[in-house]
Amino acid sequence: MICMCDVPRYADADMEEIRKMREAHTVLKHVDYEPKELYHGYTDKRLKIDLSSNSVEILDIPEEVKEKFTGGKGYCLRYLWDDTTPDTKWDSPENAITMSAGPIAGITQYAGTGKCLVCTISPMTDIPIDSNVGGYFGPFLKFSGFDVIELTGKAEEDVIIVIDGNKGTISIEKAPMEHLDSHVLGEELTAMYAEDENDRKNVAVVCSGSAAEHCNLSMLNFTFFDPKRNVVRLKQAGRGGIGRVFANKHIKALVCHFKGVKANLNHVYDISLLNKDGLKFHREVATLDNKQNAMRKSGTAYSLRTLSDYDILPTRNYKYGGTDRIDEMAP
């Protein structure tokens, strides 16, 4: 599930209130590191944070893991496997939330490279679940030096994890004053960790919101700042109740700041081939989207209509592949 909404700009950024919120933070852990430059889409580094002990580890990813699991969902599932046992439940401290963007993450000339995969053991099924989400967090994490992040353990109180890929810093901070609702929290943290108004586009926030305190089927919200509309927008990793696991670990938010995205920051193997295929892909999307998917106009919800038209929309427990009531469901 991927959906999107816009939220109003944070009250012309009441920066005095933001300053008070930040001053109320208690830094539980601070780590300086040297961000590794990408080579052919990889840094071969993973970031592992244990909230029970406030430990932060930067670990190597072996070549054989890269060859077999590639990145994205592969890395997420591999390191979820390493962190858990057959007896691990969704609310066990060792249950990990893993996030990874693939080797082409953030390539500006190829559509869809903002995607990030998220995995955990689901509170709905007690088995692994994955969900994908757009926005900027995946590329920012990659450009900050990490192919995958693992969040394990449980904090004693609500914390915010902050990664700054330009400064080379990682911190775990107790954050008592910020709002819990994602549409407000995203605005607050974007204003808090941006260097100025022009820097807001370089901040991505992951949060679960207040619903995750009450409901297993809760999502993770990923923010990004839209300069054209001058608003913070939200996308969701909506499957499997990952937000519930996030909140159960007492993570109020995960913030990543990175400034300096450019066309070939991950140094792909053959940029000329990528440019050629990217141009072809962009042309197809621009020409065919309005006729086939209407994603630009209507978003993910329109896919229900497409699935029903092709008789592959699960209906009445998969008894049918479509419905004549699709006008009530899809735009």
Place the predicted regions along the sequence by residue:
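Intrinsically disordered, low-complexity segments enriched in small residues
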Residues: 2-132, 136-331
